[in-house]
Amino acid sequence: MAKMNAIGIVETKGFAPLIQGADAAIKAASVDMVEWRQVGSGYVSFVIEGDVAAVRSAVDAGVEAASRVGEVISELVIPRPIDELDQTFDR
């Protein structure tokens, strides 16, 4: 299993802000999409990975874009996450 440099998570209320945010995040920096998932009660999130600076830049761009069309619930960047965290994602 490859070691992740950093992961970024953006959670939104509704699918349209998720798509807008994920699109902007992927275009803003050299990051890879790990997954998106329905959290429940209309909340959805996407997870990206890459180096720490790229993930931070991508999350910032994603939050800005998503907030233009809907509500951003939370955002998170984790540098050097533990290996076991990778097992929680649907790859």
Cite the ranges covered by each PLM segment.
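Terminal helix-to-tail segments of small alpha-helical proteins
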Residues: 1-91
